[in-house]
From Swiss-Prot:
Residues 1-22 are annotated as: Disordered. It comes from Arabidopsis thaliana. The keyword Transmembrane helix applies. Pathway: Nucleotide-sugar biosynthesis; UDP-L-arabinose biosynthesis; UDP-L-arabinose from UDP-alpha-D-xylose: step 1/1; Cell wall biogenesis; cell wall polysaccharide biosynthesis. Residues 51-411 are lumenal. This is Probable UDP-arabinose 4-epimerase 3. Keywords: Carbohydrate metabolism, Golgi apparatus, Isomerase, Membrane, NAD, Signal-anchor, Transmembrane, Transmembrane helix. The chain crosses the membrane at residues 32-50. Residues 1-13 have a biased composition (Polar residues). The active site is at Y219. Its cofactor is NAD(+).
Length: 411
């Protein structure tokens, strides 16, 4: 059963009074008074019972601070990465509030989490759009958040070149709304989900945290603007800030509870793993590799593929290590680049399907080679990627895809 948080208003059935006054005889007065007392007594009893019922008391757990319990707001928690982060937080005994407008996320993912953690005061879902400043402020007013993990964002490079204003609004503007609420309500920690796309196409590899940020597509530019706002605010704030710039995310929950389920209309913009799986399942006739003339070993793009389980582990470590009046900026990757052709071969082995591949011209806004140097996050947070076998990560994701051919609607 989902725990939805929303304002409720109930209208009263009323009828107009007559113009005259009725005179009640003493006996009738007594009967009416008795009924009133009975109604009041029953109402009081109902209120008492409701207040002590789990479904009624659970919202108050979210509205108050509790010693030993850290309450984390996960924006975009119904999405691919956000839902995996929420799962990890819940497993680690955090209290979690998910806020999502479901434009890219899946209510099915929230239902899975609710089924795994049904206890009152563990998880709540709030349907809201972060672009609605009043709604966001209300959420912060009614909940005692200790930290915010801000994942909510549109996140397709190709789509960003076609509809840049959507990206500046959804990423930059909405982050400002969240940041204002964080400041107004004095939330202690902010973990921001950023991207390697803020670096653009650097001259040198691997990418380190001080590599100049020169994004070349609206997605990367919008994310960098959001970073800049957070960094400027942090200069005069006691808030602890962690900015995680991560690379290409793959994989899914090793126990098969969650996976990636993009909206059908967005598949053409989606991750390469999703396209590979669609081709393996026969949803599309084959895989389209865009760009074979890059200055790389085999002519295709080179990327650093990070397993989602490792990624959320980095977020939890960042949350644990975040210190007041400090900012941490970290690359989250494996430190090893893999070409698209290598990725496709790994996907063929993982699925057992000889996927048909068509090679097409480059996609606007893409860059040739991007991979990380994760030395800083290892040194500061004692984090390193564990799931680095590309084929094994794809095998785990493929198992979920096979059992969920229609995403969470298959459950």
């Amino acid at each position: 059963m989902l725990s939805f948080s929303r304002a409720r208003s109930q209208g009263r059935n009323t009828r107009p009074l007559g113009g005259g006054m009725e005179y009640l005889e003493p006996k009738r007065k007594s009967n009416v008074m008795g009924k009133i007392i009975l109604v009041v007594s029953l109402t009081a009893l109902c209120i008492f019972m409701l207040k002590h019922a789990p479904s009624f008391t659970s919202p108050t757990a979210f509205s108050r601070s509790e010693e030993g319990v850290t309450h984390v707001l996960v924006t975009g928690g119904a999405g691919y990465i956000g839902s995996h982060a929420a799962l990890r937080l819940l497993k680690d005994s955090y209290r979690v509030t998910i806020v999502d407008n479901l434009s890219r996320g899946n209510l099915g993912a929230v239902k899975v989490l609710q089924g795994l953690f049904p206890e009152p005061g563990r998880l709540q879902f709030i349907y809201a759009d972060l672009g609605d400043a009043k709604a966001v402020d209300k959420i912060f007013s009614e909940n005692a958040f200790d930290a915010v993990m801000h994942f909510a964002a549109v996140a397709y490079v190709g789509e960003s070149t076609l509809d840049p204003l959507k990206y500046y609004h959804n990423i930059t503007s909405n982050t400002l709304v969240v940041l204002e609420a964080v400041a107004r309500h004095k939330v202690k920690k902010l973990i921001y989900s950023s991207t390697c796309a803020t670096y653009g196409e650097p001259d040198k590899m691997p990418i380190v945290e001080v590599t100049p940020q020169v994004p070349i597509n609206p997605y990367g530019k919008a994310k960098k603007m959001a970073e800049d706002m957070i960094l400027d605010f942090s200069k005069n704030s006691d808030m602890a800030v962690m900015i995680l710039r991560y690379f290409n995310v793959i994989g899914s929950d090793p126990e098969g509870r969650l996976g990636e389920a993009p909206k059908p209309e967005l598949r053409e913009h989606g991750r390469i793993s999703g396209a590979c799986f669609d081709a393996a399942r026969g949803v599309i006739p084959g895989l389209q590799v865009k760009g074979t003339d890059y200055k790389t070993g085999d002519g295709t793009c080179v990327r650093d593929y990070i397993d989602v389980t490792d990624l959320v582990d980095a977020h939890v470590k960042a949350l644990e290590k975040a210190k007041p009046r400090n900012v941490g900026i970290y690359n989250v990757g494996t430190g090893k680049g893999r070409s698209v052709k290598e990725f496709v071969e790994a996907c063929k082995k993982a699925t057992g399907v000889d996927i048909k591949v068509d090679f097409l011209p480059r996609r606007p806004g893409d860059y040739a080679e991007v991979y990380s140097d994760p030395a800083k996050i290892l040194r500061d947070l004692n984090w390193s990627a564990r799931y680095t076998n590309l084929q094994e990560s794809l095998e785990v994701a493929w198992k979920w895809q096979k059992t969920h051919p229609h995403g969470y609607a298959s459950s």
